[in-house]
Amino acid sequence: MSNKDQTNLLNNLKDIAQKAGLDISEELAKINAKLESSTALSKTWERVELARHSDRPRTLDYINLIFDNFTELHGDRFFGDDPAMIGGIGFIDGMPVTVIGTQKGRNLRETIDRNGGMANPEGYRKAMRLAKQAEKFKRPIITFIDTQGAYPGLGAEERGIGEAIAFNLREFSRLKTPIICIIIGEGGSGGALGIGVGDKIYMLENAIFSVISPEGCASILLRDSSRAKDAAAMLKITSQEVLDLKVINGIIPEPEKGAHTDPKKTADAIKEQILKDLADLTKRDPAVLVKYRSKKIRSIGKYSE
């Protein structure tokens, strides 16, 4: 039953009660509260589904739409190359920048090749290598985040996935060059944070950002994996909720029915925001950038009664 049908049914019930001289205001208030809760759950889950939509533009799509002459660079110089993590150099309105991002697949073959966008330690070490290179040559860094999380496999653990992410968190906060991070789909846990420390952090309107997936939270905390929708609402993962928590700097709008309906329009909105921030950040002293970036990151999650 749609929200409109539910509203009409309640209005009819209210009219019948009034004609019969009955006071059902208390019961109606309880029903309305349940409907509002149900609507909130539905809206949150709609965002989750849009963030995971199979046709949603990926990192490479935005790279091709926003940057000129992109040249991909490979390898972490420790173990190997990770196809789940894209990195390279491109130009935006003539300005050279380093672009880094997690890459999901579009079909089964690509998803397998890209490991579903879940990077291994070598992916995060490659990202760090390119970030250090960007600092050396005074290039701004743009990161695109779209991942369920870092890969949780045995090999990843053996090669130090936790250390790789922790190292990135520390080093990205110290880089003396502008960093802009954009969550374009799923921003999952430490996998997102590994390339998510920046001077400016944005989410696309229908992206999500969370410490754990709704399914994982439902299984662990609620002891019922079928309650993923409830968990999603509890986690406060939508762009507006994350903005309200002051974790991000802003929301980049999408077409009404999602980024996949008009990738070019979405890319144009992202490009506009990047150029606006670069015009400001590139004028700042590198030491000042680091100072305010560190302060920003340390203030996330700060709470006082």
From Swiss-Prot:
Role of this protein: Component of the acetyl coenzyme A carboxylase (ACC) complex. First, biotin carboxylase catalyzes the carboxylation of biotin on its carrier protein (BCCP) and then the CO(2) group is transferred by the carboxyltransferase to acetyl-CoA to form malonyl-CoA.
Record field: catalytic activity: N(6)-carboxybiotinyl-L-lysyl-[protein] + acetyl-CoA = N(6)-biotinyl-L-lysyl-[protein] + malonyl-CoA
Any Pfam family hit: ACCA
Keywords in alphabetical order: ATP-binding, Cytoplasm, Fatty acid biosynthesis, Fatty acid metabolism, Lipid biosynthesis, Lipid metabolism, Nucleotide-binding, Transferase
Keyword Ubl conjugation: no
Known EC number: 2.1.3.15
GO BP field: fatty acid biosynthetic process; malonyl-CoA biosynthetic process
Pathway listed: Lipid metabolism; malonyl-CoA biosynthesis; malonyl-CoA from acetyl-CoA: step 1/1
GO MF entry, a single one: ATP binding
Disulfide cysteine pairs (residue numbers): none
SUPFAM superfamilies (alphabetical): ClpP/crotonase
Name used for this protein in its record: Acetyl-coenzyme A carboxylase carboxyl transferase subunit alpha
Transferase in keyword set: yes
Subcellular location, record wording: Cytoplasm
Family, similarity comment: Belongs to the AccA family.
